[in-house]
């Protein structure tokens, strides 16, 4: 299996998707420390900025290398340089099947940023990584994520 790689930066109509760096840790920690963001995304709130830095420097990189996942992206509104969310492939089920995940700072909910970012990553992954299928999982109580899945055309396989 060849190494899964995507461009370091992608622009959409309203967003810049770019690989996250340690310089983004403070912006990322602002929303990953919030229970309303972390628990629906499947992780406990990130307690400290140091924990966020460790995640970016070690855990994320090691997971991506181990599972041969592309780097994923921070979501940035054009005209700013502030990471307000993320869109990633967080799990490889098979060589040609990845699972997508996303987070977003609550101040930006309801603006269509996650569907825009996720659609871009999905389209790119099918063309550049030759995927067969992309999966998305969310908790039953996470109605916002369910709406994103519907907007992206995902099909419910289990409830």
What are these regions (language model features)?
Residues 45-48, 64, 93, 138:
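Alpha-helix initiation/capping motif
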Residues 59-74:
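A short helix-loop-beta-strand connector motif used in the catalytic cores of GNAT acetyltransferases and
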Residues 1-38, 72-159:
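Acyl-donor (CoA/ACP) binding surface of acyl/acetyltransferases
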Residues 36-58:
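Conserved GNAT-fold acetyl-CoA-binding loop/helix
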Residues 58-59, 86:
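Short structured motifs
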Residues 37, 46, 65-68, 134:
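Secondary-structure boundary/capping residues
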Residues 32, 41, 63-65:
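Hydrophobic residues in alpha-helical segments
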């Amino acid at each position: 299996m060849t190494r899964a790689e995507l461009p370091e930066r992608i622009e959409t109509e309203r967003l810049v998707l770019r690989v996250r760096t340690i310089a983004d840790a403070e912006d990322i920690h602002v929303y990953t420390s919030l229970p309303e963001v972390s628990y629906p995304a499947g992780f406990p709130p990130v307690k400290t900025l140091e924990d966020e830095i460790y995640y970016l420097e070690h855990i994320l990189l090691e997971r991506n290398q181990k599972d041969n996942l592309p780097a994923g992206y921070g979501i940035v509104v054009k005209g700013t340089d502030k990471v307000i969310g993320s869109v990633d492939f967080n799990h490889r089920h098979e060589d040609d099947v990845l699972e997508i995940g996303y987070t977003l700072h609550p101040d930006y909910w309801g603006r269509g940023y996650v569907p825009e970012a996720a659609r871009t990553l999905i389209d790119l992954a099918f063309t550049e990584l030759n995927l067969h299928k992309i999966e998305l999982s969310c908790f039953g109580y996470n109605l916002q994520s369910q709406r994103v899945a519907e907007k992206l055309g995902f099909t419910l396989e289990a409830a």
